[in-house]
Amino acid sequence: MNLNYLDFEQPIADLEGKIEELQLVGSGNALNLSDELERLRQKSAKQTESIYSNLTPWQIVQVARHPQRPYSSDYISRMFEDWDELHGDRHFGDDKAIIGGVGRIDGKPVMVIGEEKGRSVKDKVYRNFGMPKPEGYRKALRLMEMAERFKMPVLTLIDTPGAYPGIDSEERGISESIAQNLAVMSRLRTPIICTVIGEGSSGGALAIGVGDQLNMLQYSTYFVISPEGCANIIWKTVEKAPLAAEAMGVTSSVLADLGIVDETIPEPLGGAHRDIDAMALKLKERLVSQLDRLQAVPIEELLDTRYQRLMSYGNSAV
């Protein structure tokens, strides 16, 4: 895969460009460039480690939005067996920004619900750029209630710039659909594990984000409004977005310190898009472990713990 590099990754891009040039030169003649290639690879790895160990919140926002970052469909295809996608909300239609269905993880039947942004231009339009409408959240709700009936745990994968704010979305009750999901998820009688895999923005993320366990991938983000939106409201310019990202505390490390996030899952060096298979394997291992723990808890105790967990939000900031 040819990587796209972000602006702050330019030193890495320069080194990788030199490596590619040497590989082309070496393949065309008898020169032995293995030592020089190894030196450059080590230098590139050190440069990547140096940059990624000192990322600013705004840079992490950019990594979370990376165009090659794995989406819900990438994880589903790698982590679940016997996957069978389910469609429609039984009221209006089938929102392609939400994908959901039944599958098995480590042999355990689960209901999986994820937000999907789309990769190509055509797919982004098809998926509405990952911005669900009311029918998307009502589809998610239908699948969660089905999971409850069949005693299947629910796993959600969060990755959205927000719920779709268009007129048609408002006419069909986007705020009501989000609120209904929050209410039902808070008392759903089956384990729920939520994982932010990329961008978790506003009510669009919360609508599938209430559960017994909240994970964030290392370079994912979670916020009530995008840094650009916050900057535009407060400073009347999106140029202050980096400052807004710093002030809002959008990263997994900050949210873990606040007690909002239960676990931060490490990513491969340079982000999940550098090694999607390794990231999927790591996430699968953590989900299986968390499922084993939650399924061993009696349901009434699980619901009480979930309620107490929700009621504790904000205590660390008081």
Swiss-Prot record:
A single GO molecular function term of this UniProt record: carboxyl- or carbamoyltransferase activity
Sequence ranges assigned to domain CoA carboxyltransferase C-terminal in this UniProt record: 32-293
Gene (name only): accA
Assembly mode: Acetyl-CoA carboxylase is a heterohexamer composed of biotin carboxyl carrier protein (AccB), biotin carboxylase (AccC) and two subunits each of ACCase subunit alpha (AccA) and ACCase subunit beta (AccD).
Pathway note: Lipid metabolism; malonyl-CoA biosynthesis; malonyl-CoA from acetyl-CoA: step 1/1
Signal peptide positions on this chain: none
One of the record's GO cellular component terms: acetyl-CoA carboxylase complex
HAMAP family: AcetylCoA_CT_alpha (MF_00823)
Location (main, coarse): cytoplasm
UniProt source species: Saccharophagus degradans (strain 2-40 / ATCC 43961 / DSM 17024)
The protein, known as: Acetyl-coenzyme A carboxylase carboxyl transferase subunit alpha
Family: Belongs to the AccA family.
